[in-house]
Amino acid sequence: MTSVDINNNNNNNNNSNSNIIETKLIGHKDTVLCISSHNKKEIIASGSDDCTVRIWDLNTNKSIQSIVEGFQGNPVNNVCFDQDFTLYCSYDNIIVSFDLRQPNVILKEFNTQYKFNTEEINQLSFDSKYQYLAACDDSGQTKIIDVTKNKLVESLNKKHTNIATGCVFRPNSKNELITSSMDFSIIHWDFLKAKVLHRDTFKEGSLPQNISKSQQQQQETTEPNRMLNPPFVTSVDCSNNSKYVAISMGDGTIVINEISSFKQYLKINSIHKSSIQQVHYPKYLENNYQRLISFGNYDKKIVIWDVSEDMNTKVSSSLLSNDEKNNERIKTWLEHSEKINCLTTSNLKNNAIFVADLSNDLKLLSIQ
């Protein structure tokens, strides 16, 4: 097995309002593209441009297994654990699964292969019972696979008119899924019936209704990104209480909707100086609907927000957001040393963020 070096240091390259300890998990030979944490085991998986996947032990921060074949020489764009011992990986439009119970340190053979998607897959996501796997792709479609039967059960298509950027199941629901797209919209589905329950569209250049000219001028001043970047939806995530869906957009905006009504719960404008790449509810919090993590596409800034009901009441007296209100919400922020590809957290490791950036090293950021 390739040796793995661990470097622990105070993150002097980062500007931050908290003490951040950065640990490098060294093993990949090219950029890390994706990360997934296991909900029951203290392990994470990472996929890379080096066309391999590594499994990491969170107790030692060392690589304990690597998957070096099965991807036909393609970068691994997505990884996703089931509840037991199987890891699902995607490259191009293909999904393959691996049994991690194998005693081998280096894995070469996959268990199952799915070729239901027609274009490159952008996200893999499991439902709460780990029966259904969703895979959204560049065609705008999302495929629903029953992994217990190894068959396609539904294709969610003809509703998104551009790339499907994200898919997430509503926790503890029987049949609800939310997808996001570059067509400026998110859709709330009954995925077993391929039925649209709700749709929210964030059209380019749209402004709230019934605002004054001075308010519009203020929005143009405080939301310069909206004038430059269209509000395509880059990611979605659901809170673990099943009540909220968080949405990140290309104009630097974060929106949270109540899922049942699909009405807007809150909106945060223009903290990132670029499009927002991802929003993520931290898994290490029991009530994670009170906090939200975001990072920008090019500004390299990671922000942890207070999105609790108490804070929302405090700052919602005005229709329009501003820097002062944003500062009230910010619990932690840091400027990472590299452009970030994705991040995740683990319910088994408190106050820790795992970051995949343009370097070859997976980063563990421990918030003190």
From Swiss-Prot:
This is WD repeat-containing protein 53 homolog. WD repeats lie at residues 27-66, 71-108, 116-155, 159-199, 228-267, 271-315. Keywords: Repeat, WD repeat. Residues 207-231 are annotated as: Disordered. It comes from the Eukaryota. Belongs to the WD repeat WDR53 family. InterPro entries: WD40/YVTN_repeat-like_dom_sf, WD40_repeat_CS, WD40_repeat_dom_sf, WD40_rpt, WDR53. The gene is wdr53. Coiled coil: none annotated. SUPFAM superfamilies: WD40 repeat-like. Pfam families: WD40. It comes from Dictyostelium discoideum. Gene3D superfamilies: YVTN repeat-like/Quinoprotein amine dehydrogenase. The keyword Cytoplasm does not apply. The lineage of its organism: Eukaryota, Amoebozoa, Evosea, Eumycetozoa, Dictyostelia.
